[in-house]
Each structure stands twice: as C-alpha cells, then as structure tokens.
Amino acid sequence: VPYITDDELIRLDLLAQTAVLTSQGVPFILSGEEMLRDKKSVHNSFRSPDSINRLDWNNLKRYTQVFDYYAGLIALRKAHPAFRMGKAEEVRKHLEFVDAPKGVVAFRLKDNAGGDAWRNIYVVLNSQKTPQSVKVAEGSYTKVVANGKVNAEGLGLISGSTLTVAPQSALIVHD
C-alpha cells in the first residue's frame, strides 16, 4: 500500500481483523491473512502464477505479532459465546452500539450475552490516527485486547466511565 508504513499497515490489519472476529455471524479469513499475505498489488490474481499466489512462509517469522494476535482473537471468540450468538433475537437483545466519535465504532455485548461468563463486554474500534474516547457505564473493567495484544486473562484494569483507545487499534474490556 503506497504512503503507509509497515507499522501502520499492521495496526490497520489488526483493527480490521478485530472487527471481523468480534462481529456476529461466521467470520471469513482469507488464506495467509494471519501473516500479511501480499499479492504484489495484483488485484485479480486468479490467472496469475504461483509467484504471485503463493504463501510466503517467511512472513510467519516476519509478522509473528500479527499471527499471535489472530490466534488470540480466535481463541477469545471460541471461549466467549457473546461473540457468536446463534439467533437474531439474541443479538437484538444483547448488542447495543455506544455513542462514539467519527471514525470509531463501539458496542456493548450486555447481560452475559449468549450465556457468557463476562457480564458486559465493550468493543471499541478506532480508525483515527489519534487516541479516541467513549463513555461507558461507571465500573471496573478488565482489558483483554489493547495495543495490538490479546490476553483473555487480562492486560490490566480500567476504572471509571471512559474508555480511551489508542490510534488505529481496538480495545476490548469486560466486567
């Protein structure tokens, strides 16, 4: 991608994948996404040779952080039914969008959605190049996704009624 650094590309990729893996429904991940597969800017590679379509396994070493993030998000999704409710009425009952600034999507999965052990889960996706904040219910929250890291056991605690998410990244917290 022209005019973008590798660091920004990685941040945006992780942000996009967080949107995919925290959305309801069946997630779809293309082959090689977890290692930043590159098709050399060929937009329709159907008839391109293997040199364009192959998986470059060296990228797995080069982008370990990306692979680990994907694996962590997949594990988080599998462990928490709130991210994969099976019926539309469940989604309507347990998912609510949170007011957010331009370039930010925020939602809450509430009331132990899908039978989840976590009572409330806030997902905040920030596409802006500056930190952004959203107002939430006053409380003490455990961070499980922040700054390109995933840890279901927790990355720290946040108390209060404001969640601030780093530029071009995602924040997931629960109580």
Region locations from a protein language model:
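Short, polar loop/linker segments at the starts of domains and inter-domain junctions
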Residues: 1-6, 151-162
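Solvent-exposed beta-hairpin/edge-strand motifs
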Residues: 137-150
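Loop/helix patches that line or flank the sugar-binding groove of alpha-linked glycan CAZymes
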Residues: 1-139
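Short, flexible beta-strand-to-coil junctions
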Residues: 111-113, 129, 145-148, 175
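Short, surface-exposed, polar/charged, turn-prone segments marking secondary-structure boundaries
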Residues: 56-59, 83, 149-153, 170-172
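C-terminal beta-strand-rich structural cap/linker in extracellular carbohydrate-active enzymes
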Residues: 155-175
